[in-house]
Amino acid sequence: MSRVCQLTGTRANNGMAVSHSHIRTKKLQQANLQNRRLWWAEGKRWVNLRVTTRALKTIQKKGLGPYAKSLGINLAKL
């Protein structure tokens, strides 16, 4: 399973690790993904999603149904 948020599509970021002597090496900054079982009120059922913690905060604020609708995601297919 790839490390991608199922709602926002967030992926790993390519960055640099910089040492004290300023030697730079490539590194991946992974998204903070969590497997969560979320209640979808409109569908009256639980939905298993792999989402970032940032998306979880937005879900708490807006609700799962309206947030998924604003992103153009059909939760019935998940």
UniProtKB/Swiss-Prot annotation:
Keyword Ribosomal protein: yes
Cited Gene3D superfamilies: Ribosomal protein L28/L24 (2.30.170.40)
Pfam families xrefs: Ribosomal_L28 (PF00830)
GO biological process, one term: translation
Record carries keyword Cytoplasm: no
Alphabetized InterPro entries for the sequence: Ribosomal_bL28 (IPR026569), Ribosomal_bL28/bL31-like_sf (IPR034704), Ribosomal_bL28_bact-type (IPR001383), Ribosomal_bL28_sf (IPR037147)
Entry keyword set: Ribonucleoprotein, Ribosomal protein
Gene Ontology CC annotations of this record: ribonucleoprotein complex; ribosome
One GO MF term attached to the UniProt entry: structural constituent of ribosome
HAMAP family xrefs: Ribosomal_bL28 (MF_00373)
Family: Belongs to the bacterial ribosomal protein bL28 family.
Name of the protein in question: Large ribosomal subunit protein bL28
Name of the gene: rpmB
